[in-house]
């Protein structure tokens, strides 16, 4: 319950805006939770300063790949009754654009940020100037198995090491 209140409060604060709000929606837990929180705040906090023009979901689509979560994102937008914009991401990004994005991020990531950059570009083209997104929830809650292993250096004793090991094994 405490996490829920903190999460809703964090979203509510970020919805204070006098410009159009949107969100990058993948259909995963983090972005779905964010847009559902925005919907909840809009319905239940009418007297607050939260922006009422937030119903814009932008979805990066990767047809025919394991990365495509379009059907999950559509379920969320249908459930909430909000607009969605689907943007098919072309895997043949020009070299110049790829290099520009590398320059912007100043580092090489395990996966290029091309989809995110293209999605934000589309948001801007369609009039959304602020995007409230759910990035990094997987990392925050150890959604990736390898993140659990990062807890080993902080373990105090065998009991905590065993707990970390069990958390890792239970994810697999």
Regions inferred by a protein language model and the residue ranges of each:
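ATP-dependent adenylate-handling active sites, centered on carboxylate activation for C-N bond formation
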Residues: 1-172
């Amino acid at each position: 319950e405490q996490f829920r209140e903190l999460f809703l409060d964090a979203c509510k604060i970020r919805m204070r805006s006098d410009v159009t709000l949107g969100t990058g929606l993948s259909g995963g837990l983090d972005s779905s939770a964010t847009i559902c929180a925005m919907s909840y705040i809009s319905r239940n906090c009418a007297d607050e300063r939260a922006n009422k023009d937030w119903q814009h979901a932008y979805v990066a689509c990767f047809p025919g790949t394991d990365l495509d979560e379009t059907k999950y994102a559509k379920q969320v937008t249908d459930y909430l009754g909000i607009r969605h914009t689907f943007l098919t991401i072309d895997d043949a990004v020009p070299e110049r654009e790829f290099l520009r994005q590398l320059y912007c991020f100043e580092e090489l990531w395990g996966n290029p940020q091309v989809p995110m950059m293209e999605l934000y570009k589309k948001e801007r083209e369609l009039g959304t100037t602020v995007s409230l997104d759910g990035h990094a929830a997987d990392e925050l809650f150890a959604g990736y198995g390898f993140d659990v292993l990062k807890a080993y250096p902080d373990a105090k004793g065998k009991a905590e090491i065993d707990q970390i090991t069990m958390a890792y094994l239970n994810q697999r």
